[in-house]
Amino acid sequence: MFKSWIKRTIFIFLIIGSFALSFVFAQSYDSDRMIPSFDEISPFVDSNRYTHQKAETYAFNTQDPFLDALEIETDSGLLSVDLASLAFQIENSRGYIWSSTIDYDREGFANTFKNRVRSALIIESFNTNNNNFAITEENLFEPGTTITVTEITNGFHAHITFGRTKIKVGLYVTFDSGILNVYIPQDEIVEGDVFKLSTIKVYPYFGAVIETETPGYVFLPDGIGALYDYKASDPSIGSNYQKEFYGRNMSYNLETDLSNFQNLGKSIYAPVYGFVHGVNQQAVFAYVTEGAPYGRLNLYFPSRNRGVTTVFSEYVYRRTYSQPIDRLGNVISLLQGEKNKFDVNITYHFLENEDANYVGMANTYRNLLDIEHTTSNLNDIPFRMDIIGLEKRDGLLWAETEVMTRLEDVSNMLSDLSLSGINHTYVTLHGFTKDGVTWSPPYYEKLSSRIGSSKELTEIKEASTYLLFGTEYMKASNRSRGFTQYFDLAKKISDQTYRYQSSTDIKYLLEHEKTRALLNSSFDALSSYDVDGYLIGSFGNMLYQDYQNSDSLNDQITWMQELLSSKDEMIVLYDAFDYMFEVMDAYFDMPMYSSQYIVFDDTVPFLSIALSGVMPLFAPYANFYPYARDELLRLIDFHVYPSFILTNRSSKFLQDTSLEFIYTSSYRDLNDAIKTYYHFVNDALKYVYGEKIIARDVISNGVVRVTYENDVSIIINYLDRPYNDQGTIIQAKNYVVKNN
């Protein structure tokens, strides 16, 4: 429909001698009520929450080719290998030399540092003869280390025996189809009796930069994405950046309330990273295809690393942990017995010219995911509305039930939205059983008659695009049924249970097998209801080892993928990590920011670019926007759709429940905001609904142009003043849609 309209319009414009076409937002929902957070233009305050212009300063080679290297002819070109360190060099089509080390032979670098930056691997191990399990670090220049290299097709295979610990590691490096692949199989890691492997750092100085010798930046998948520009040493930076892929490992802590065991900042949602040497010149995008659940990402800053900036991945095979020995809180330190079992596999993708930037990395990642989902044929973007049905609280003598929204109320909401032109809706019912939102998990058997009937449910399905039940099968409330605390709870390595405490209940993480059984039985019990599918809590972002049954993180990922892919119902997940992307039909609570650490220079929408055109992406709830217009512009910029959590009754009735943090939810209070917000976003994104983002350019700091596959671009002006883009005026905190 849009394409045919464009053709007619272009024909008219050609008659009058003009080809330019643009659409400027004009509010299509009339309301007498002012919405201050939307209607008032707040000052633009620049920070690393935005993306900034990057100079395309030329990047020169900073080192010469290796001397006396092993030169391996591959299908993708010459792979030069320094046999002493297993460092490699590859020359790209622009004549730029990519190297896994730096120009280390210079004044000021100690020999110990030179050895580190040259080494392909750096390992840490625990000394079991030491009561404190002292850490020993080794690189390939440790005295007594032996390396045996064998040429294989398109690369080499190295057998390494480290000199001090006698730990043996096998390393495969191949260069094929323009991709460098590094592989460490678990069955080629052999430990001795005394030293036990802790971690392996893999090519930790690949793409490293000394001070400001090379222009460009590091890309980190922190939250939605972040950039760190190469720069001179800053003494104020106190520590390097380190974060585990997929969030902190919960299996080794002693925390009795895991609500307190949070990530510091945003999670890493995908095991990727990259570095750009000369913007739009050359870049490397790294993708960890095996080993990510036990991996972590490191960024070393120049002030903490002798003037060198480098980004790399590291893999954890074994940890120490504290074991409680009595009820007084006394503990002893123990070493994990069996090492974690996993292979390490990293692919490095070489990007050039217009692809040598974070957008090129996102597009590369999208192609590697190779996920194709169908989108609806509606012309407008979707709107997500999460509905709270029942919620429970403790009363003086017995539990009290608050009926926040009946199914009849939901139908009325949908009718009202339809009159305002909002017809593409994802409706999720939370608290649809008698135990309410908080106390139901993990047991869902039937719809509570207190919120409505099956017939009313069918009416909602007919009025909405998709209707979902909101469920949770990993976290089990002590106020619920379907499990026993004696036999069904997962255990940490210390034999403690995983617990979350709220004001009204305690939730436990269940054994993996129990979670599978509960999900299957729930789907069977609810199959008679006319819904499209399920929003499943925790499956998207909750990884934990079940030491009670020796289930690893890799085991959990495998069974979750297999379980959900076997279901015919629509599956939606919250805040999900990349290992679940293939089994999802929509993404709820897409991260919209990076951690915004002071060391970061930019926030970039890497994740939403990678998933654009792949599946619908929905933002966290817009109920709580303090500066709505800024947040809505971000939705348009990142191609993410608006969401609200709604009730019929006032949110004051959630007081003294576990949902009392929801301070505004009444549809009556929010309906003007819903309609205004939706149409503001829809009037931009409806022209590119279901399309992939192919480019994102910062025209000027605070002004961004996003280009789509269908040749439509949207210019977003975050500034508090109008911006003139070659004759096109974009009003303050507004946008223009253009057909190119």
Model-predicted regions and their roles:
Residues M1-W5:
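N-terminal secretory signal peptides that target proteins for export/translocation
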Residues L378-E459, L467-A517:
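Aromatic-lined carbohydrate-binding/catalytic grooves of carbohydrate-active enzymes
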Residues Q27-N377, I714, L719, G727:
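N-terminal accessory beta-strand-rich subdomains and adjacent acidic, glycine-rich linkers
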Residues L83, N92, Q186, P204, ...:
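Glycine-rich, histidine-containing beta strand-loop boundary motifs that form or position
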Residues I422-T433, Y466-T471, D524-D546:
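Short acidic catalytic loops
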Residues K7-A26:
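Sec-dependent N-terminal signal peptides of Gram-positive bacterial secreted proteins and lipoproteins
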Residues T347-Y426, E660-E691, R696-V698:
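Terminal accessory/anchoring regions of large secretory-pathway or extracellular enzymes
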Residues T74, V81-N92, Y269, F275, ...:
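Active-site-proximal substrate-binding groove within the catalytic cores of carbohydrate-active enzymes
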